[in-house]
Swiss-Prot record:
Pfam families membership: Beta_elim_lyase
The protein's name: Tyrosine phenol-lyase
Effect of V420I: In strain: MT-10509
Gene assigned in the entry: tpl
GO biological process, one term: tyrosine metabolic process
Organism for this UniProt entry: Enterobacter agglomerans
Record's subcellular location: Cytoplasm
Enzyme Commission no: 4.1.99.2
Cross-referenced HAMAP family: Tyr_phenol_lyase
Description of post-translational modifications: Contains L-DOPA (3',4'-dihydroxyphenylalanine).
Catalysed conversion reaction: L-tyrosine + H2O = phenol + pyruvate + NH4(+)
Family membership noted in the UniProt record: Belongs to the beta-eliminating lyase family.
């Protein structure tokens, strides 16, 4: 298959090597069949995550050299603040060490115990902070998002009827805020339409309910709007992003994705009282409001990276490279989540491993098998990631049981995608050999990061 050249030149390289299959089997066993616990030196192609694994540009590296490491009032913070205000349109920004820090602040600031947070599908760390602060997360994403085989645009949209029902049943005063993820990670990187954002904003405004976006992959979402939503084909990515955020009261952001850096994040809001409280709280958990746990050089790189992410040539290449991998797997009959999203290809582990029940952790088993057979590291996104109910202690049982092949930005070429696809296609041809797993160590919180498993 023909494919376009990358829209960049490579100035620095890192040597990688493939260890033998016997060695990979041994390494996987030592890691308790958890791909998070593998050593990076033993990975050939690392598709665990797109978080903090980006390649920075020459301009970002140059910006690192003008890092102002003052404890307070760093010039790099003011550059970041100016950039975010211009591109997102929010009045205030509080930097954090990464997106999780912003989630922590928002949850403490916006949630009262006993309230509900409505959102378009959960995310692991986001829901953890919401529940830790006394909220119950309610999934109001459209039903189609839970069906891996449906190829529909904007599967990340909120179901407005579900939102209206929740407001009626629980009362607007009992909804802390609406958490709108753009894009929806665990649905397969599915985008949200501008029309849906606008409609959610209108309904929320009627009831006085705040909306906070999980903006981590907002630029990817903007690309899908430009590509697929009528009326936006001639609108710039920058202008689409700005309109997206005009329908929100604030956002959490992990800079480790669409800001094209290795560390960093921020919390945005328009409300003055919340901003004052956030500045007090960030000192406790992150650092001064002008650095939030970050070095000045990292804030500078984040400001530059956010502008670079808005360049059409970059984001087109980014999304189409992911789509290329998805297309190649689909054409070979490998079951994936449809349509391919913006940051990853999600293998449908239920269809890939139909001989395994959900209690045998098919996605975890598949991720381990992919590494042992191909040297590619991926991530489980199914029942293990979903965790347990805080009320009953029983496993959450997501309808989607997937393995995420997450493409780092500006790191791999199309040739790497070919290698990944060929290896997984070969594995699929003897999928019945994949064995189920069970816990040998289960952490109480965010278990997927450090759990250990063995074959049943």
């Amino acid at each position: 298959m023909n494919y376009p050249a990358e829209p960049f030149r490579i100035k620095s390289v890192e040597t990688v090597s493939m260890i033998s299959r016997d060695e990979r089997v041994k390494k996987m066993q030592e890691a308790g069949y958890n791909t998070f616990l593998l050593n990076s030196k033993d990975i050939y192609i690392d598709l665990l995550t797109d978080s903090g694994t980006n390649a920075m540009s020459d301009k970002q590296w140059a910006g690192m050299m003008i890092g102002d490491e003052a404890y307070a009032g760093s010039e790099n913070f003011y550059h970041l603040e100016k950039t975010v205000k211009e591109l997102f349109g929010f009045k205030h920004i509080v930097p954090t060490h990464q997106g999780r820090g912003a989630e922590n602040l928002l949850s403490q600031l916006a949630i009262k115990p006993g309230q509900y947070v409505a959102g378009n599908m959960y995310f692991t760390t986001t829901r953890f902070h919401q529940e830790k602060n006394g909220a119950t997360f309610v999934d109001i994403v459209r039903d189609e998002a839970h069906d891996a085989s449906l190829n529909l645009p904007f599967k990340g949209d909120i179901d407005l009827n579900k939102l209206a029902t929740l407001i009626k049943e629980k009362g607007a005063e009992n909804i802390a805020y609406i958490c709108l993820a753009v894009t929806v990670n665990l649905a397969g990187g599915q985008p949200v339409s501008m029309a849906n954002m606008r409609a959610v904003h209108e309904m929320a405004s009627t009831y006085g309910i705040k909306i906070f976006y999980d903006a981590t992959r907002c630029v990817e979402n903007a690309y899908f709007i430009k590509e697929q939503e009528a009326g936006y084909e001639n609108v710039s990515i920058k202008d689409i992003v700005h309109e997206m955020f005009s329908y929100a009261d604030g956002c959490t952001m992990s800079g480790k994705k669409d800001c094209l850096v290795n560390i960093g994040g921020f919390l945005c809001m328009n409300d003055e009282e919340m901003f004052s409280a956030a500045k007090e709280l960030v000192v406790v958990y992150e650092g001064m409001p002008s650095y939030g746990g970050l070095a000045g050089r990292d804030m500078e790189a984040m400001a530059i990276g956010l502008r670079e992410a808005m360049q059409y040539e970059y984001i087109e290449h980014r999304v189409k490279q992911v789509r290329y991998l998805g297309d190649k797997l689909r054409e070979a009959g490998v079951p994936i989540v449809e349509p391919t999203g913006g940051h990853a290809v999600f293998l449908d582990a239920r269809r890939f491993c139909p001989h395994l029940t959900q209690d045998q952790f098919p996605a975890q088993s598949l991720a381990a098998s992919i590494y042992m057979e191909t040297g590619v590291r991926s991530m489980e996104r199914g029942i293990v990631s979903a965790g347990r109910s805080k009320e009953t202690g029983e496993n959450h049982r997501p309808k989607l049981e997937t393995v995420r092949l997450t493409i780092p930005r500006r790191v791999y070429t199309y040739a790497h995608m070919d290698v990944v696809a060929d290896g997984i296609i070969k594995l699929y041809q003897h999928k019945e050999d994949i064995r189920g797993l069970t816990f040998v160590y289960e952490p109480k919180q965010l278990r997927f990061f450090t759990a250990r498993f063995d074959f049943i």
